[in-house]
A protein has these predicted regions:
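Interfacial helix-start motif at the membrane-water boundary
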Residues: 49-57
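Transmembrane alpha-helices and immediately adjacent membrane-cytoplasm interface residues
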Residues: 56-72
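Membrane-helix interface/capping segments
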Residues: 71-87
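ATP/adenylate-binding site constellation spanning eukaryotic-like Ser/Thr protein kinases
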Residues: 79, 98, 155
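Non-transmembrane, membrane-adjacent beta-strand/coil modules in membrane-associated proteins
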Residues: 84-149
Length: 167
């Protein structure tokens, strides 16, 4: 029997991450586009020859694919657990049964100071984080004494759906 999803949230990267990635992709493609005459004001090369940047294109394709697959954090709360999944393909997943949760609360924290940034991170102080942007999170106090921060735009909306200890 499948547990019913009681709450679901998708949190994507900040706008500036998208802008930086777009800039890098365009900067990498610019030389070839110029050689083909696809940039206004630059004359087409008489002999563009074979694509000299094939390894670069391959690298860009892999980066764009990786970015597309890993572009968001999905948080789901079911009747029995919290489920985390990274990306559209949900290749990286984590399940936290309510029986392993001792407490849950919404917090404001410093991702840079506490974890060195965003993403899936670990701290030497027994804390870990799954975040994509911002400084708001659902903090889960786990039975083993560790804490898990789950990035959220509005973590206070998640708290009522969590039943610590499986109650």
């Amino acid at each position: 029997m499948r547990s019913q999803v009681r709450f679901e949230e998708r949190t994507g990267y900040a706008w500036w991450v998208h802008a930086v990635i777009l800039f890098v992709v365009l900067a990498c493609l610019a030389p070839q586009l110029a050689a083909l005459g696809l940039i206004p004001g630059i004359e087409k090369s008489s002999d563009p020859g074979p694509p000299p940047f094939f390894p670069l294109y391959l690298g860009l394709a892999i980066a764009v694919l990786f970015y597309g697959l890993m572009g968001e954090l999905r948080t789901r709360v079911t009747d029995t657990e919290v489920r985390l999944a990274w990306g559209a393909a949900e290749l990286i997943r984590k399940r936290i049964p309510f029986s392993e949760i001792r407490g849950a609360r919404a917090v404001t924290y410093s991702p840079l100071a506490e974890f060195g940034g965003w993403g899936i991170r670990w701290s030497a102080k027994g804390k870990s984080a799954w975040t994509t942007r911002g400084n708001r999170a659902l903090r889960l106090e786990l039975a083993d004494g560790k804490a898990l921060y789950v990035g959220s735009d509005r973590p206070e909306r998640i708290v009522p759906f969590i039943r610590p200890g499986g109650r």
